[in-house]
């Protein structure tokens, strides 16, 4: 489904380079999906860059877990899953190894971005929609 394929998604510049390398013709002569959904959806709601989609798209639908502070400042585990994939009750019974832990992959991707940009600058993110020549 494409319910999570929202507009205004951003990617690191290094991810945009991969998309540009594989979909140059689409970006220069194609038109983005209308505002409101991801620019890379076609009229049928399918992803036009699925094979080389960015990380944010690859993690959608997975059973996710992360560690964060609660209101009292205590660290706790949180989990989430798209209700179209399974119920929250099922999610709570999953072993940790069966969940995608948020944090390590994002940090590694950010490190790749930092290593490929001007020293001392913030990691650059680009809106997917802005990759298209035609708006």
What are these model-derived regions, one by one?
Residues 3, 10-135:
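Short loop/turn segments that flank or connect secondary-structure elements
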